[in-house]
Structures are given as C-alpha cells and as structure tokens.
C-alpha cells in the first residue's frame, strides 16, 4: 500500500470515528428500589399503586421489572383485584393445603404457622417479572400485585424492585 492510500484510509477511519461519536448511543439503565410493607397477619396486601408510583418517577420507558420478596414465609402473586372473594377463596384453599397441625411437621420452633407458611411460599412465587412498555406496566385489566402473607402475626416485609431498560 502506498503512502497516499494509507493516508486515505486514515482520513476515512477518522471520519467514521467522528460519525460514531455524533450518533447518540443509548445504554440500558438499571434502577433498584425497595418497598417496605407492614403486614397485620395472614392475607393479601396490594402493592400495585406503590410500584406504579415508583415506576412513574423513573426515566426508563421500556424494559423489565423484577420484584422479589426477601423472606421465606410470605410470597408474591399477581391476582384479580376486582372481587375480594377471589383472595378470600385463595387464602382458604392454601390454609387447607398446608394446615396448621404440629403433628404434621418437624419444623415447629417458630410456631404452628411457620412450616405451613414455608410450604405456601414454596408453592407460590418469591419473585415476579413484568414488562414495561411506554412507561406502563403490562398488567391485565383485573390484575394486581400482591404480597401474600402466610404468618399469623404482623411482619415487616421487604420487596426488592430491579428495573432494567431504556
């Protein structure tokens, strides 16, 4: 290659580098957040609005939201938010599935509700993954985000939110 051709290549490469620098390069962003919920014993606790309120403050328009609960005796579910009978029936079903009977379990040191709480947690979810499109969480018309508390006494629960997107 002669010097003129080499110089031409250098000029061409320099122009390409300038073009690349001028282009806006978008990177994926990540944001972490914790929602603290104080429960008053067994039942479902809707945290949809708290999550949506936090999402509305973020700069991310499209992405994935992962929510996980940092406990082994409560869980997360997406469930109908229109008819409270659904939540009542679900709680009753799980109470029958994992009854509070000390004779059934070895792990009873934290109370009669402890092992049934672990079973219910194992059968449901400890994390949820949802899509975010145009700053809107993709949920069905009747869907809400719930913490499903399996213990009888009040607890403070931590829900870790991890949003990834652009």
Question: Residue spans of the language-model regions?
Answer:
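Active-site histidine-anchored catalytic micro-motif
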Residues: 2-166
């Amino acid at each position: 290659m002669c010097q003129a051709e080499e110089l031409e290549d250098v000029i061409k490469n320099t122009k390409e580098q300038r073009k690349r620098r001028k282009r806006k390069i978008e990177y994926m962003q990540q944001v972490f957040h914790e929602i603290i919920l104080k429960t008053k014993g067994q039942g479902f606790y809707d945290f949809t609005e708290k999550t949506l309120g936090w999402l509305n403050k973020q700069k991310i328009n499209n992405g994935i939201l992962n929510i996980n609960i940092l406990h082994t005796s409560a869980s997360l579910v997406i469930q109908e938010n229109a008819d409270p009978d659904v939540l009542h029936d679900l709680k009753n079903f799980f109470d029958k599935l994992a009854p509070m009977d000390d004779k059934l379990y070895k792990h009873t040191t934290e109370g009669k509700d402890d092992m049934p709480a672990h079973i219910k947690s194992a059968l449901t979810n400890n994390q949820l993954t949802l899509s975010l499109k145009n700053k809107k969480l993709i949920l069905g018309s009747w869907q809400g985000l719930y913490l499903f508390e399996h213990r009888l006494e009040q607890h403070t629960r931590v829900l870790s939110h991890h949003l990834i997107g652009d």
